Amino acid sequence: MNDLLKGSFELPRGQSSREGDVELGEQQGGDQGLEDFFKKVQVIDKQYDKLDKLLKKLQASHEESKSVTKAPAMKAIKKTMEKDVDEVGSIARFIKGKLEELDRENLANRQKPGCAKGSGVDRSRTATTLSLKKKLKDKMAEFQVLRENIQQEYRDVVDRRVYTVTGERADEDTIDELIETGNSEQIFQKAIQEQGRGQVMDTLAEIQERHDAVRDLEKKLLDLQQIFLDMAVLVDAQGEMLDNIESQVSSAVDHVQSGNTALQRAKSLQKNSRKWMCIAIIILLIVVAVIVVGVLKPWKNKSA
């Protein structure tokens, strides 16, 4: 029983599934349905690797976009980023579906002997699934940070473009209007008159293309926000449930340890009692022998 209780805590909460969950699967893979369970965990883990690569790719594309000054180049980057964000959404929804499937299987697995709610196997499955949910929530949060960075740096780029063309810093309301509408021709009217329409049109086209790119990317990235919120709710709810289970198991461990201590103490007392009983018997035998000798006085019989 101690081994079972101890085994249930081999997976620290919050540990990454690659370092914790899969390792636990290797240790207990053949136990009561865990082998198949951890194969599915590994499938999900590979999807997280894809999300990591896509996040880095999107971050690199975003950095590249900040130095682009031509509309065609901006359009090409936009196309690449939209494709990558679409793939992120597909993977995230796939993972979410697999996690929901694991939840259903975890409930069904409790019907097996030795796998009831709160058992070592059940806690291993629940903790691993919770870890995967937390990982998805954290990944979606990273993409939301990317969305916020794109929005903020888009504002900085537009501000620089206006200054480059007009030689003047635009106020916040002007920048807000540009970001909101993408219509910059009115703002650059003076520059068009001074420099000629042809020289300014490239900048106007690039700003419009950038506006469209940021708007479309933000919409797609916001779609991931719902997955983040769903995972946040599940992680909080299931985390609290797991805390309660672990608290109960911890209490059970304490009771078992207390019982073992009491048992050892009882054995020690029993051993000491036997020891003193033997000593008392020996003393009693000595006293009886002395009394018998004193009564019989065998040395007088010899003298007679």
UniProtKB/Swiss-Prot annotation:
Disruption phenotype: Defect in cytokinesis in embryos and defect in seedling growth. Pfam families: SNARE, Syntaxin. Residues 204-266 form the t-SNARE coiled-coil homology domain. It is found in: Cell membrane. Part of the t-SNARE complex. Belongs to the syntaxin family. Vesicle trafficking protein that functions in the secretory pathway. Acts in coordination with SYP123 to mediate tip-focused membrane trafficking for root hair tip growth. Functions in root hair elongation by forming SNARE complexes with VAMP721,VAMP722 or VAMP724. Involved in cytokinesis. Acts as a cell plate-specific syntaxin, required for the fusion of vesicles at the plane of cell division. Required for secretory trafficking to the plasma membrane during interphase. This is Syntaxin-132. It comes from Arabidopsis thaliana.
